[in-house]
From Swiss-Prot:
InterPro entries with a match to the protein in the record: Omega-atracotox, Omega-atracotox_CS
Function: Insecticidal toxin that reversibly and voltage-independently blocks both mid-low- (M-LVA) and high-voltage-activated (HVA) calcium channels (Cav) in cockroach DUM neurons. Also causes a modest block of insect sodium channel currents (Nav). Induces potent excitatory symptoms, followed by flaccid paralysis leading to death in house crickets.
SUPFAM superfamilies cross-referenced by the UniProt entry: omega toxin-like
Tissue and organ distribution: Expressed by the venom gland.
Protein name: Omega-hexatoxin-Ar1d
Length: 78
């Protein structure tokens, strides 16, 4: 077996193994167990003093406009 044939055989083997492993984590469009594994949300929140795009992401659940070091007004978590 020459080098080119060996490389092709390894690529085919890697593709087959990849397809078998991907079978375990494919998205379940019905909202079953696979969907819960793939689409998991982190329970982290934005600490106080950090910029906040939305109030619900702040640990304090509160976001107000404050002046930053440049003199601009930005929303920050309380």
């Amino acid at each position: 077996m020459n080098t080119a044939t060996g490389v092709i055989a390894l690529l085919v083997l890697a593709t087959v193994i990849g397809c078998i492993e991907a079978e375990d984590t494919r998205a379940d469009l019905q909202g079953g167990e696979a969907a819960e594994k793939v689409f998991r949300r982190s329970p982290t929140c934005i600490p106080s003093g950090q910029p906040c795009p939305y109030n619900e992401n702040c640990c304090s659940q509160s976001c107000t406009f404050k002046e930053n070091e440049n003199g601009n007004t930005v929303k920050r978590c309380d």
